[in-house]
């Protein structure tokens, strides 16, 4: 069984037992969280698509860790004007493990 959930402004296809990194969630390590914005649920050939959410569907997950992604370097430049700007960015994330999908 798999589901498509929305969290942090992004959509993820998840199945039980998977680990994934999502946008930072304010929860403690080891805490169980529920992802209730389930857009679709599928099993085998059957697919249930919500309008916009599947009623009564919940994905339970456990918080494994918090961290920061690798640095993304931003470099802006205007040619012939001697203008250069360097900037870096590291996005925070939360690593979760999907425990169960109920629909």
UniProtKB/Swiss-Prot annotation:
Organism superkingdom: Bacteria
Biological process terms in GO annotation: translation
PANTHER family in UniProt: 50S RIBOSOMAL PROTEIN L21 (PTHR21349), LARGE RIBOSOMAL SUBUNIT PROTEIN BL21M (PTHR21349:SF0)
Functional summary from the UniProt entry: This protein binds to 23S rRNA in the presence of protein L20.
Subunit structure: Part of the 50S ribosomal subunit. Contacts protein L20.
Protein family (similarity comment): Belongs to the bacterial ribosomal protein bL21 family.
This protein's name: Large ribosomal subunit protein bL21
Source organism of this protein record: Bordetella avium (strain 197N)
């Amino acid at each position: 069984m798999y589901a498509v959930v929305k969290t942090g402004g992004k959509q993820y296809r998840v199945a039980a037992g998977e680990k994934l990194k999502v946008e930072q969630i304010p929860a403690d390590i080891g805490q169980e969280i529920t992802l209730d914005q389930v857009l679709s649920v599928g099993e085998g050939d059957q697919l249930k698509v919500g309008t916009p959410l599947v009623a009564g569907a919940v994905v339970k997950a456990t918080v494994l860790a918090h961290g920061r992604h690798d640095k993304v370097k931003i470099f802006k430049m205007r040619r012939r004007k001697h203008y250069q700007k360097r900037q870096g960015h590291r996005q925070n994330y939360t690593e979760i493990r999907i425990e169960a999908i109920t629909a």
